[in-house]
C-alpha cells in the first residue's frame, strides 16, 4: 500500500539528529520554557521575517490566543464578528466561537478553494473586527484587494498558516503577511513535530507580550496572573525536534512542488479535475494535492483496491457539523460542492518515483 503520508519514513531521514536532540533535552533536566523553545522561536521568526514568535501547544490554541489577545487589548469584545472561510477545517471556526466572537462564513473560490476575496466586503458589518484567512492546502490566500479591504474597514487580518509554512506572496512569507498568524506543527504538517505543537507570529509587540502571558496561565511573572489564561506551552523536546526539521523545510517543499507539477502534467483523465498551478510556484507549498471528481467514493475505493491510500479534506463543512447546529439550515453551495467532490492524493518528500508513476497510471486507467 502506498501510504498517504509516510511519517515514519519522513522522520527516519533525520533520525540521528532527532535522537541527539531528544538526548540533549533529557540530559539537560529542563523540559519546559527553556533554551530550546527560545531557540526555535528565534529560528521561526527569522524564517518568516517576523518580529515575534511565540511557541504554543497546538494550532487551534495559536488562533484562539491571537483572538483572545485582541480581546484583552480592547480591540475586540464579545459578539464581535470575524470573517472566516466556509471551506476550512473546523479549527479555524472553533477559535472564533471559543472566544465568544461570531464567525461569519464566506464562500471559497472554485479556482483555489481559498476564501473568495471578492465576496468579503458584502459580509462586513459594523461588528466586523477581523478577517481570518486560511492558506488552505498550502496555497497563499492573499491579494492587494484583501489589503485594501482591511485598511478601508480597519480590520485585522489573521492568517491560519497551519498548512502553508514557507509559501510566499511577492517575496513575503506566510506568517508575515497579516497582523498575526497561527501555525500548527501537528505531525502530518509540512513542518511536523513528533506530537502536538503550534506557534504564533506577529509584528505587534503588545500582542506578542499578551499572548505569551495568556499561554502561560495569564502570567508574565510566576505566581502573578494578569489574565485568566490557559496552559498552552510547547515542550522543550518538541522545540528541539522542530529546530532539526526546520532546516530541511525548503528542500522538502521543493520536492512537493515537483510531485504536484508532475501530477498535473501526467494525469490525463477527463473525469478528474486537477488543482490549478499558481503562476508563481512559490505561492503553493502543496501540503495537500487535492483533486475533484463526481464519483469520489468509487475512485477512492478503486485506488484503495489498487494499493493507494487517499484521504478527504474535508468530508463535512463546518456549517454542517453538529457542533454548529445553528447553521444547519444555512446554505453554502460552493463549499458543499467541494466537500462532496474533493480527494487528496499522496504527496510528500519521501515518495519514490515508482510510487508516483503507479498513482498516475492507476488514475489514467480509471
Q: Can you name each region flagged by the protein language model?
A:
Residues 30, 34-81, 95-99, 105, ...:
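Phosphate-binding glycine-rich loop
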Amino acid at each position: 500500500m502506498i501510504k498517504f503520508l509516510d511519517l515514519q519514513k519522513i522522520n527516519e531521514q533525520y533520525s540521528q539528529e532527532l535522537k541527539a536532540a531528544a538526548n540533549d533535552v533529557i540530559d539537560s533536566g529542563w523540559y519546559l520554557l527553556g533554551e530550546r523553545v527560545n531557540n526555535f522561536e528565534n529560528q521561526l521568526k527569522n524564517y518568516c521575517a517576523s518580529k515575534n514568535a511565540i511557541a504554543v501547544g497546538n494550532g487551534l490554541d495559536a488562533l484562539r490566543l491571537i483572538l483572545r489577545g485582541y480581546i484583552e487589548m480592547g480591540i475586540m469584545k464579545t459578539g464581535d464578528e470575524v470573517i472566516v472561510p466556509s471551506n476550512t477545517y473546523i479549527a479555524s471556526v472553533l477559535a472564533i466561537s471559543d472566544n465568544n466572537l461570531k464567525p461569519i462564513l464566506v464562500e471559497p473560490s472554485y479556482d483555489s478553494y481559498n476564501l473568495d476575496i471578492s465576496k468579503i466586503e458584502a459580509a462586513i458589518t459594523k461588528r466586523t473586527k477581523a478577517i481570518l484567512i486560511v492558506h488552505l492546502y498550502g496555497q497563499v490566500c492573499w491579494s492587494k484587494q484583501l489589503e485594501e479591504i482591511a485598511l478601508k474597514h480597519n480590520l485585522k487580518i489573521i492568517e491560519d498558516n497551519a498548512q502553508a509554512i514557507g509559501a510566499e506572496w511577492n517575496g513575503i512569507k506566510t506568517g508575515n503577511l497579516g497582523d498575526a498568524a497561527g501555525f500548527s506543527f501537528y505531525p502530518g504538517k509540512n513542518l511536523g513535530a513528533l506530537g502536538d505543537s503550534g506557534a504564533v507570529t506577529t509584528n505587534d509587540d503588545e500582542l506578542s507580550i499578551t499572548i505569551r502571558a495568556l499561554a502561560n496561565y495569564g502570567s508574565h511573572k510566576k505566581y502573578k496572573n494578569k489574565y485568566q489564561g490557559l496552559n498552552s506551552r510547547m515542550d522543550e523536546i518538541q522545540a528541539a525536534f522542530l529546530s532539526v526539521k526546520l532546516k530541511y523545510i525548503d528542500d522538502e517543499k521543493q520536492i512537493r512542488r515537483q510531485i504536484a507539477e508532475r501530477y498535473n502534467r501526467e494525469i490525463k483523465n477527463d473525469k478528474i479535475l486537477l488543482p490549478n498551478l499558481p503562476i508563481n510556484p512559490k505561492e503553493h507549498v502543496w501540503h495537500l494535492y487535492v483533486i475533484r471528481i463526481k464519483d469520489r467514493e468509487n475512485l477512492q475505493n478503486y485506488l484503495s483496491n489498487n494499493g493507494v491510500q487517499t484521504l478527504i479534506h474535508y468530508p463535512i463543512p463546518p456549517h454542517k457539523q453538529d457542533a454548529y447546529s445553528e447553521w444547519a439550515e444555512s446554505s453554502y453551495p460552493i463549499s458543499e460542492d467541494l466537500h462532496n467532490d474533493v480527494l487528496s492524493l499522496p504527496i510528500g518528500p519521501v515518495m519514490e518515483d515508482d510510487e508516483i508513476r503507479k498513482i498516475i497510471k492507476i488514475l489514467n486507467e480509471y
